[in-house]
Structures are given as structure tokens and as C-alpha cells.
Amino acid sequence: MQRPTRESIEGLRPISRSLSLDLVAAIGYGVSGALVSSLLPTIARRGGLEPLGLAVLSAAPFLTNLLSVFAGRFGPRSTRQFALLRGVGAGSLVGLAFVPGTTVIIAVAFVFWISISFSSPFQLRLWGATYPGRMRGRVVGFLGTGRAAATAMAALVGGLLADRLGGPTAVAMAGLVGAVCALAYAGFRASAAAAPLAYSARESIRAMRARPMLQRVALAQGFFGGGFIAAGPLFALVYVDRLDLSLSDVGFIGVLGAAATTISFLAWGAIADRFDGLAAMRYGSLIGLAGLIDYAFAPGLPVLLIAALAIGLSSSSIEVGIAGVISDQTPLASRAAAMSGWNAITGARGLVAPFLMSALVQFGIVNVTTGLLLCAAASGTGVALFWWAARRARADMAASIGVDPAA
């Protein structure tokens, strides 16, 4: 076995420093994002927000994803700008402590998700310029593990604080933690290659459409993720209207989901490095589909806990898979543009799905159970398309080297 040299150890120090700062920022995102995702819809529902209003709240991250097609012009171009944008997004949640109300909840949710959507293309390019490609999946898995662990702890503590101090105060405290942790990116030493070239909305879409593999995976994720997006507002109806759960119960569901995500991130990252990102998405989507079906029939909290575990395992596989597929299919120079195009294409379906299903439920056309089963049917289509995309990828690779894929 070759012993490590002084030069090899010195070469790892910049990566270790960057990884540490990345982890601090990821923890802050996990804390603030936990309460935005798990508690904010329930808080809004208890505040009187109707199903269509919940749909607006659920659509917020996808509208901002669609708008991130303009990130090439208005997104961060340095690590300091990156830190500022993430800090402002998390810090906006503090406003709930002073001006509570459903309108303010929707407004701060939009500000929070804008900060995430507009910074994610820069972040993916930053990772590509900072970390070696051979360890990309494990880096994403490591950071995801830290963020998911923070999410689990924040969901547990946040649920307890929400019951004692009130939901808006708990969310505001999480936003403060996220804003402070986002400052870690200001100390990130990135190479000049990390600064993306300016690109237009048209160029970001072109970067996606130029790669058939990305189009196939985006189509699959459109159906799979679309089913979960449509189901999002219905989850709050299950918690409040069907089962009348407390905020601490909802927080505990979030804890288990985040715990499942935490323990699975590194495993999915290793799978992505060993095979490819699509392998993680194929198997993870099957697990997530089972969790969505559980929600449709859940008679009580125990079944919801099982569903949360399944969905948590699935969400980490999708996140690792997306980063892996886009990185594998694009050179560093066009990676930020491709990520913006991905966000825009997948975000467009997020604008329609929650409103469609919430309207069907609110106007009495379907009940919550039927609505969730329709969502599961859409996600099941996405699962099938992930497997189809993998088969096409193998066929294309075989054709490129002159091998019969059926052999």
C-alpha cells in the first residue's frame, strides 16, 4: 500500500476546508428548510388557509425554480454573493415572529425558495470546480447527510417549540440559524473556474435540450416529482382534517423522514459513484412510490411514520441522482446553465400540479384518498420512465461501441 506523502496531504487541505464550510452552510439550510417544508403548511392550515392557498404555498419552490432560468443574469457570481443570497432567504423567515399571518407565510416562503433556486446552479458549478469528479457522489452524499441530520433535529425541536411558543416563532428561530450558517460561504475559497459565464434563459433551456439523456430523465422526474408536488397540499389535509395531529406529531413525522434521508445519502452517493446517478433514482423512486400510497390509506400516525421513512429514503436518491446525471452529461462550462434549464423545466410542472389536485379536492370532485391515489399514478409513471431512460442509456452506449444491446 502506498503511504500518503506530505504533498498529497497538503493537497487535501483545501478540499477539507471547503467541505467543512459547505457542511456548515448545509446544516443551516437543513434547519431552516425543515420548518419551511414540514411545519409551515400545517401552521398555515391552522391559520385558516384553504386548500388552494396551500397549493400556492406548495407551488412556491417550483415557481422559483421556473424563474431560476434567469439565474445566469441575476444569480450569484461569487461565493460572497452566494452567501448573501442564502442569508437573505433564511433571514426573511425571522419576519414571521413580528408579522404573523397566512399572507406573510406565503411571502416569506417565496423569498426563501428564491434564494435556493437562484443559487443552486452556481453551487453545482462550484462543486465541480472544487471537488474531484471521482468523489462527487460521496461529497453530495456527505453534505446531504449533514443537512438531513440537521433537518431531523430541527423538525423535532421545531415541533416542540411550535407547541410551546407558537409556530411563527419557531420558524423565525430556524430562519435565524439558517442565515448565520449561510455566512460560511463567504469564507469559501473557490477557483476562478467556479465563476460562471453569464447565460440567458434561452441558453439555459438549450443546454438541457442539447442532451437527450437529460431530457429523458427530466421527463421521468416531471412525472415522479409531479405526483409528490400534487400530493403536498393533501398531506396537510391528512394531518389536520383526517387525523387532527398536533404540530409535535407533524414534527416527528418530519424527523423520521429526515432521519431516513440522513442514513441513506452516503449509500446513494456510493451507488452513484459506482454505477451512475440514474441507478440511484431508479431504485429510490420505487421506495418513494410505496410511501405515497401509504399516505393515501393511512388510518393513523404509525402508517404515516412508515410512509415518511420511505419518502425520506427516496428523496435522497433523487437529489444525489440529479446532481450526478447533470454533472455526468455536461462539461463544467455549461453545468450552471444546464442546472438552470433543469430547474425551469421541472419547476413548470410544479406550478400546475398542486393547484390541479387541490382544486379537485376543494370543489368536491375527489376526496383526499382518491386524490392521493391519482398522485401515486403520476409518480408511478415517472418510475417507469426512469427505468426506460436507463435502458435507452445502455442501448446508446452499446451502439457507440458497436455491441448489440440484446446480446
Predicted regions mapped to residue ranges:
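Juxtamembrane intracellular "pre-TM" segments in multi-pass secondary transporters
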Residues: Q2-S16, A192-A220, V403-A407
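Helix-loop boundary and gating motifs at the non-cytosolic
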Residues: P4-L66, G72, M213-I253
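Loop-to-transmembrane helix entry/capping segments in MFS-fold secondary transporters
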Residues: P51, G133-L143, L247-S248, L332-W342
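Helix-to-loop junctions at the C-terminal end of transmembrane segments
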Residues: L67-R80, A162, S264-D276, V361
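Structural signature of the two symmetry-related core transmembrane helices
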Residues: Q81-G95, A279-D294
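Multi-pass alpha-helical transporter architecture, strongest
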Residues: A97, V180-A192, L373-A407
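Intracellular juxtamembrane helix-capping segments at the cytosolic ends
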Residues: F118-Y131, S317-T330
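A membrane-interface helix-boundary motif in multi-pass transporters
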Residues: A162-G178, A359-S379
